[in-house]
Amino acid sequence: MTYGEAVFLGLVQGLTEFLPISSTAHLLFAEKWLGMGVKKDLYPEMATHIGTVAAVLVYYRALFADLARQTIRGGPGRRTTLLVLLATAMLVVVVLVHQAVPAVKEWRFDVRVAAIGLMGVGVFLLATKWARHGTGEPSVVTSIAMGLAQCVAAIVTGCSRSGSTIGTGLFFGLDPAAAARFSFLMSVPAVLGGSLYEMLREKAPFDAVDTGPIVLAGVVAFVFGLAAIHALITLVGRGKLYWFGPYCIALGAAAWLWLV
């Protein structure tokens, strides 16, 4: 990977990891355009995921610190932490699906699946315009539902994680700010756990990897990830999550026509 490719991939990952437009699909399309072998470039993608997780931790540093204190000492934050862990535990479904249907693992690199996933999540995002919401904190049922939505996004390339989880939260009655906040909290263990799972599953050698571009990709993803978080929080707070629907549908259709 060159430094130019590292900057490009970091930019794509940083902007699209949190905006509900599927970072994996955008990376897949970008890597196809750059002529890179996506199955051989595990570590650059892992670096960008770590960069975006760092962006969440920095953006919500006060919230994470407060949750840590309340979880240890007791308080309302302990319940939130347990609900995040409950939602994250749903990811065992992904492992079970991969074991039961090994062919599903190849969906990650399939442009057709990414195109269909994008169009599907686009329709879902459009539907959130009519979701009724009000409560500020997720229930156990809502946490499980958002966790299962995260599973679907992990299995079906193109199905945005943030779009699926935030949208599900809205349909289960959360107000936009609470849905987005809980989705970001869920993203930290999910993304880190997913990266570790991919590394162990792929068993890619690290000794021949050029660390310079990898580190650069992670830093770029961190910077643009912060900007994307702020943009999404602003739009979701205004009830405009559905704005991303037409873009996902259009990009999915274009990818199907030109890349399939």
Predicted regions and their residues:
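Multi-pass membrane proteins that catalyze or facilitate reactions on polyprenyl-/lipid-phosphate substrates
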Residues: 1-260
